């Protein structure tokens, strides 16, 4: 590919990733609107359903969200009664998000979403989905390492 072609939209790896991410979120929307959730709120609740409680810092790392996005999102979920935030008893600087009984009830209501999404994407062969999943996590891991190296070198200049 010559330099002129390198700036064409269809030659960018980032574009189909971006477009697919948007389309996936769009496909989730009707299911999540029925629960009064956004996609980002949904994945935040997924972490709480798995772990019960988590530090806000660790939640942000796991979901690749900064505090500017996470704080208002958690406030909204807390106002709905799905979680409770509190300071750690061992370190006042650490804020812990803990699932509530209402949050557990929400899990039961949301339990049909993964199956519904699988059904909506049933034309996409399972083997392709598994390969894509593996490749995306491989790419994500590589990018995380690369970005950490860049962040480290910026801090040490």
Residue positions per predicted region:
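Short capping segments at the starts of secondary-structure elements
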Residues: 51-55
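Pre-recognition alpha-helix immediately N-terminal to the DNA-recognition helix
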Residues: 16, 23, 43-46, 105
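C-terminal regulatory/oligomerization modules of transcriptional regulators
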Residues: 1-5, 127-157
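N-terminal leader segment of winged-helix/HTH proteins
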Residues: 1-35
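Charged, amphipathic alpha-helical coiled-coil/dimerization segments
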Residues: 25, 75-137
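The alpha-helix within a helix-turn-helix
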Residues: 60
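Short, locally clustered residues in the helix-turn-helix/winged-helix DNA-binding domain
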Residues: 18, 46-50, 111
């Amino acid at each position: 590919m010559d330099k002129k072609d390198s700036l064409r939209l269809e030659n960018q790896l980032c574009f189909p990733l971006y477009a697919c991410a948007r389309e996936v979120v769009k496909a989730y929307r009707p299911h999540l609107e029925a629960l009064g959730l956004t996609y980002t709120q949904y994945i935040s609740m997924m972490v709480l359903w798995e772990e019960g409680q988590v530090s806000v810092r660790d939640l942000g790392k796991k979901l690749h969200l900064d505090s500017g996005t996470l704080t208002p999102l958690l406030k909204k979920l807390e106002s709905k009664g799905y979680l409770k935030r509190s300071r750690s008893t061992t370190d006042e600087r650490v804020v812990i998000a803990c699932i509530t009984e209402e949050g557990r009830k929400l899990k039961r209501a949301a339990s049909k979403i993964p199956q519904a999404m699988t059904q909506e994407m049933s034309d996409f062969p399972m083997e392709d989905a598994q390969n894509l999943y593996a490749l995306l996590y491989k790419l994500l891991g590589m990018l995380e390492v690369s970005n950490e190296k860049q962040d480290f070198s910026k801090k040490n200049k």
